Amino acid sequence: MYQSRRRRRRRWGRRILSRYKRKWGRRSRRGHGIYRRWRRWRRRPRTVVTEQHSRRVKTIIVRGWEPLGNICPTDSARAKATPYASYDSDSGQGQWHGTWGHHWFTFQSLVDRAEARLNSFSGNWESYDYLRFLGGTMYFMQPREMCFMFGNDPYLMTSDLDKTASQKNRAEETWITPGYLMHRPGTHLILSRQKVERRSMYKIRVPVPTSWRGWFPIPDCFSYVLCHWYWTWWDPDACFFDPCATGSSCEAEPWWSTAQTKQAWVDRTKLDDPPVGGTGPNQKTWAPFLPSRPCTNYYTHSASFWFKYKLKFQVTGENIWAPVPRDYSQRGTVPTAPSRQQVESEARAPYPKTNRPPTTADILPGDLDSDGILEDEAYERITRDNPCPKRPRPLGIRWWDGTPGRTLQEQQQAAVLRPKPRRQLLRRLRDVLLQL
């Protein structure tokens, strides 16, 4: 009698597997049970392709430093520093000292600062079509004695402020005062070493503005604002009195505490300049956390404020044109830094002078006498009808007969060396005119 083979006992969870018994085949219920995956076999809906990006992407990092200005003992509370005017335009002259300021970065301003060697690009955007901004970082060094505030406003506007016809965005200048920026979000208080000792630099992130989301054509986005910053000097020790005022200014009531002048201190551009002889305790020359000027009794040194930045960009696109590789065999891998004489010569002569071959109508060496008057032969050569000289032919082989052509020196000698003319009549005419 045929005896069936004994069924092998399962050595794993028999009772557990009985709950999830496969009823419709082995592959129909895969992914269910104790080893179930979340939506493993669910089909995703098909989407329509709306845009296609190029795979040719390049990252460009811009590293540099930006001057904010110098703090001098003679600067008033309303003095504005504009060192950026020296780089944004060729004819601009910026003021490098003041107690506050603000400006912005555009891609064009970064290129202008690269020409002045204030920053450097990690790569070039030649043969690319589109660009996008990925944010960056600003680094600040701790001052020795003075303190200042710094803020970044990434939501100012899209285009460059200097190129807009309206002046509505200039209203932000009226709010850059320490008493108002103290309670505004995004304002960083950078204290001196006398207040707080730090080993590393202050690091401030530069977010991507809302208007910079996505890719933009490179020629169109040169004037878009990347980030807008503002800064101001402030004194945490002399907050509610003017230390530069004469008399007992600490005991006097501030001029901006009355009912009529509660908001008059906000616009620092409307403050008065302190007189030379000294200010009184109730003069409108100072504001909360902002004395009339950096008093020499508190500060023994002037200060320079600046920051270091690192901005990140990406370029993409398939351009039909490609740049020519640089030939390193002529100038080497690292060129020589420009000297002062080279920079001045380039500024004085922007267009190079072209040297043309001399002709018989030119005043040649030896044509003038001791009194600076033309000789007879030179005068006759210049005033007579001279045919237009032919274009000098370079040294080489003519393609039609294979004979070597004349050099440039031979053609010039043939055009200049001609037989000396006779000028007896002109000499007599000159003698008659001299006698008259």
Swiss-Prot record:
Region (Disordered): 326-370
Cell cycle among keywords: no
Bias type Polar residues, positions: 330-344
InterPro entries registered for this protein in UniProt: TTvirus_Unk
A GO cellular component entry from the record: T=1 icosahedral viral capsid
Pfam families membership: TT_ORF1
Subcellular location: Virion
Key words, A-Z: Capsid protein, T=1 icosahedral capsid protein, Virion
Similarity remark: Belongs to the anelloviridae capsid protein family.
Reported function: Self-assembles to form an icosahedral capsid with a T=1 symmetry, about 30 nm in diameter, and consisting of 60 capsid proteins. The capsid encapsulates the genomic DNA. Capsid protein is involved in attachment and entry into the host cell.
Protein's name in the database: Capsid protein
Source organism: Torque teno felis virus (isolate Fc-TTV4)
